[in-house]
Amino acid sequence: MSPGGKFDFDDGGCYVGGWEAGRAHGYGVCTGPGAQGEYSGCWAHGFESLGVFTGPGGHSYQGHWQQGKREGLGVERKSRWTYRGEWLGGLKGRSGVWESVSGLRYAGLWKDGFQDGYGTETYSDGGTYQGQWQAGKRHGYGVRQSVPYHQAALLRSPRRTSLDSGHSDPPTPPPPLPLPGDEGGSPASGSRGGFVLAGPGDADGASSRKRTPAAGGFFRRSLLLSGLRAGGRRSSLGSKRGSLRSEVSSEVGSTGPPGSEASGPPAAAPPALIEGSATEVYAGEWRADRRSGFGVSQRSNGLRYEGEWLGNRRHGYGRTTRPDGSREEGKYKRNRLVHGGRVRSLLPLALRRGKVKEKVDRAVEGARRAVSAARQRQEIAAARAADALLKAVAASSVAEKAVEAARMAKLIAQDLQPMLEAPGRRPRQDSEGSDTEPLDEDSPGVYENGLTPSEGSPELPSSPASSRQPWRPPACRSPLPPGGDQGPFSSPKAWPEEWGGAGAQAEELAGYEAEDEAGMQGPGPRDGSPLLGGCSDSSGSLREEEGEDEEPLPPLRAPAGTEPEPIAMLVLRGSSSRGPDAGCLTEELGEPAATERPAQPGAANPLVVGAVALLDLSLAFLFSQLLT
């Protein structure tokens, strides 16, 4: 199990959980300032790995993380929609399924958080679009299939002719119930999702009749022209045939070819109601979420248009076929047929009609090619949608694991919280992330990025503890309690050779130093120095963990005028196979480190001590010879 603790951010955030090598590692919980936002789950070397993030507004993410960003499989939930699938660089990417509470759903490819590539979108009323996408909008070739007219969503604005794509589309209210005896509904009461063709009595036709009281065109709005033409209804080629007439006017006024003259004012046709079971499908080009380019739209009752489109309207050259089999063709402008505009040349009418016919044929041929391309893209989009559904299922499974990891992290945080309530100064960091106060309590050096760590944390002054060691607070304590019988140099192996060896010689040296202790006593070493077995990081020595008592060593001093030599010790902590005596080892370093303490001026010189010990041994040897 990884060691654990608590880390307080300067902005008020907090992390409680495990860490390793100065970074968040294992299970942990990280909260933002004022407990706004929380991540709980697994951590890996300072970054989120698998867990649950809950935002201030209640939205959540459950899944994989990498380098502080959402990466892999995951589920994001907000108040009005849910996304399940793959993530790339913190954004929705590759493949996934997006669903809204209104019933709108997209399944397919994603890029940079938007629908991009191939996918299938199902609208709130049940209609579908299958085809290409770009930057979250329908763009390229695709097929839009509507539901029966009485089930189609009622658009809020009469000017709208299509449902918008993507999660930006708000929920559409259900369509009103039809009146008794009316299976469908009048198009004038509002547009329906997926229905864009305007036939006799449709919305565009009704509005055009209101704007054009007479069927002869906008020239008849003038009272002066009406008076001049009161004697005869037939107009000249330069006036009558050059007028702008609406689509409904041409359809109602005559059953002949476009541009034919009417023998009298046309009779007002009753509004044609769309059957409740009628459906409509469009296959062709899309640009910026609208029908634009070449395409074909066909209704189940036989109404059909082939040609050019712009902004969900017939615009350009095309051909319209009515349910009764009659046709009209020519140039359309904003969903209305234009009969060549005002004639400003003396070209024969037959020659002019021939040029229009040629352009119409080219437009119809382009529309049919667009239908073929759209059908191919439709099949690809269906396959990508099936793959996205599989990714969504896998993401849901990962989300369940993330929830379990979050539960474990919260349990561990609750267990660690009482242990961390002991008083003590906590480390604070300046703007550059360096410690400005002494470390009295171990802290996980995690990376701060908003609510969660994102970059490297400041390392502790000493080498990190081994993964096999249990956690210990970094407060440096002396391992030499009163009354102890062992010290860091209690083993004979730890004595330097120039100090006289081991055994009885060491006892004689200790007795000799004890006699002069009062006069040779110098300033003792500082807390945390290697001589006292102190430590500068969170892990203690093996002796400290076992609670063994150690005997303090007498201080050493050097005679006046001699240069003190620094003594460097590296304390290696951790379990050892050579027994408790090997708990603290010493190693001479080439250069003095930050934790090295040079000998004090009042300490004894090791050379002098060695010389005195050698003299004492010589005297003892001579005395023994005299006795023998």
UniProtKB/Swiss-Prot annotation:
Source species, domain of life: Eukaryota
Q: Where in the cell is it found?
A: Cell membrane; Endoplasmic reticulum membrane
- Where, in residue numbers, are the MORN repeats? 50-72, 74-95, 96-117, 118-140, 141-163, 164-186, 317-339, 340-362
The record ties this protein, via Pfam families, to:
MORN (PF02493)
Entry keyword annotation includes Transmembrane helix: yes
GO cellular component terms, semicolon-separated: dendritic shaft; endoplasmic reticulum membrane; junctional membrane complex; junctional sarcoplasmic reticulum membrane; plasma membrane; smooth endoplasmic reticulum
List UniProt keywords, sorted A-Z.
Answer: Cell membrane, Endoplasmic reticulum, Membrane, Repeat, Transmembrane, Transmembrane helix
Q: Known InterPro entries for this protein?
A: Junctophilin, MORN
Q: Please, one GO biological process term?
A: regulation of synaptic plasticity
- Region annotation (Disordered) maps to 158-214, 231-276, 415-602
Composition bias of kind Low complexity appears in 231-241, 253-272, 453-467, 528-541
- Topology with respect to the bilayer: Peripheral membrane protein; Single-pass type IV membrane protein
* Cell membrane among keywords: yes
For bias type Pro residues, the affected ranges are: 170-179
* Intervals, Cytoplasmic compartment: 1-606
- List, as start-end ranges, the regions of compositional bias called Acidic residues: 432-443
| TM region(s), chain numbering | 607-628
- Known role: Junctophilins contribute to the formation of junctional membrane complexes (JMCs) which link the plasma membrane with the endoplasmic or sarcoplasmic reticulum in excitable cells. Provides a structural foundation for functional cross-talk between the cell surface and intracellular calcium release channels. JPH4 is brain-specific and appears to have an active role in certain neurons involved in motor coordination and memory.
Q: What is known of its domains?
A: The MORN (membrane occupation and recognition nexus) repeats contribute to the plasma membrane binding, possibly by interacting with phospholipids.
The family assignment reads: Belongs to the junctophilin family.
Q: What is this protein called?
A: Junctophilin-4
Please give the organism: Homo sapiens
Provide the organism lineage as a comma list. Eukaryota, Metazoa, Chordata, Craniata, Vertebrata
